[in-house]
Amino acid sequence: MKKRIFALLLAAMLPLGAAIADEPLTDGTVLVDWVDGQEAYTAICSGELTLRYDADTNTYATADGLIWKTEGALPFATYQPLLMPRTREELLQCNAIYAALQDASGFWSEKVTGTEVLPVCAAPDENSYRASNGKASVSLAGGATLLMQYGDWSLVRYEVNSSRMRIGWVHTNQLGSAPVMLTDIPVTLKDGAFLTDDPATSWYHTAEGDTLTDVRLLAQYDPFWAYARATMQDGTILWGFVPLMSVQLNDTVDAEAMANVSGTWGFCGGGELMGWVFTLMADGQGVCYAISDEALESMRYLTEGITADMNPESAGMFQWQIVGGTNGYAHDFILSNTSNGTCVRYHAALTEDGYLGFYQCEAGGHYQRIP
């Protein structure tokens, strides 16, 4: 552990661009350079993974093309080496959680000031857990950052002391405008998991994972943390941050639902989320077809089916599953790219009139079976 931290600090102290970009890295080392006007990590070695930032695609990837899904280059201050994926399996797990949380919007960051001293709760509920022996509060005179609003509550980040931050809820919606969309993903916590109200500095354990029930992910905070809600042993509600690496999705494949939608489908209306024409095979393999502009405009594939000018795309091969649904849907559809390790998750529904619908956030598209 000390060796990894020392290697990180040593790399951080190097002059920007001092290391050779293609030079092999050892576990725990990084390269730092300027990206879009800020210091960011351009290469990270973690366990068996060496991830290099590609400005053209705005992603991190291994030499053989495995992508780690993040929102662009990691700024210098956000990297948390102890929470990095260290194996291919862990990276794929992070990508799956990233896809599962796409219904949720990001956090805001708006500075707020004032004169009030406000009680701070761990959830937007007067009966939820309250830190500091039930006395946690924030003085707006000292400054705070508004992260989101939920009903008539506001989530704020503030400094407790020089080595401790806290993120919690205050019962007011007058601090600014920070609307968000939250999701609701049931998960299981792995051994050693914990929830914290300080994901940036102290990682103070508000609760240990094995003391929590009904854990559900609400949003992704950054590449290393998810925002979650849970219930404590005494029934108290608790919201906080959990490391992505300590979360396991509770997905169960629905073989009957997969059998019901196997076949070839063509786009017929709404948002074109899944490509124009694709085939879902019963073994979980799938393929998208490259079709001509004329076929796109006329949608003749809906009556003629696959014709000579509609060829399977080698880059359009994918794996697919149907699992239990989230956010009120009966089923979710997971599309996985086996070549780069990324995946996309949609809510899915087979309508009474035979259309297959895919939905994500506020977008949706419909497909019909084709000959």
PLM-predicted stretches and their roles:
Residues 26-39, 256-276, 320-322, 367:
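Tryptophan-anchored aromatic micro-motifs
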Residues 36, 66-108, 157-186, 229-257:
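Boundary regions of SH3-family modules and the immediately adjacent low-complexity/disordered segments
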Residues 25-42, 59, 90-155, 185-225, ...:
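Beta-loop motif signature
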Residues 9-15:
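Bacterial N-terminal signal peptides
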Residues 79, 83, 169, 244-255, ...:
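Edge beta-strand at a domain terminus
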Residues 104, 270-332, 343, 357-361:
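N-terminal glycine/threonine-rich, aromatic-flanked beta-hairpin/loop signature
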Residues 47-70, 81, 136-170, 210-244:
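SH3/SH3-like beta-barrel superfamily modules
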Residues 16-26:
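Sec-dependent signal peptide cleavage junction
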